[in-house]
Amino acid sequence: NQPVTGIHWWGMFGGWTESHLPPDLPVAFHIGIWTDGTRDSDVFDHPGSLIWETYSTNWVWAASGNEESDSKSEPGETCFLFSQLLSQDQWFQIDQARDGSGSTVYWLSIAALYDSERDEPEHVWTWKLRATASGAAGTSAQTILPAANGLSWPPTLGAQWKTGREIYDSWFNPLDMAFQL
């Protein structure tokens, strides 16, 4: 089992159609890896506990196309590829993460963090969604149970996914966030 040494993800900034980044960028991305919580639940596939995290502040980006626009007369939002290489002390070691369950399923979360001292950004970052290879839908997080003495947002190690919803397109096809490890 090879460690995770870097993460690549795709996303857009609401309403942004230029090939360069908008002025109201996140100060960081919170990246987390979660156990699989499905075996302990009778609801749809979903994360369990946060077992690894990092804050990405030195990511690199590239414009990687445009989303389709609802209007033929307007351009679609620009899609950006974000990349974060991890230093060796940040690598996610899969063998060390096993919790005795035998599960080989892990969940990735990436959230944009904005400066709380500034106005809400005009162009908020969102995930690029895509059809899933596995047929399982990605899951949003609506409620996270904080770890003891931890913050609820962003989550800290030991936090637990409590509620959320599966992500589908308008034809009820499962969607997942676009990423590569």
Question: Which stretches of residues belong to each language-model region?
Answer:
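A short beta-strand element within beta-rich, extracytoplasmic domains
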Residues: 2-21, 108
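Generic structural microfeature
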Residues: 2-3, 26, 103, 174
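PGST-rich, cysteine-poor low-complexity/disordered linker and tail segments that act as flexible spacers
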Residues: 129-181
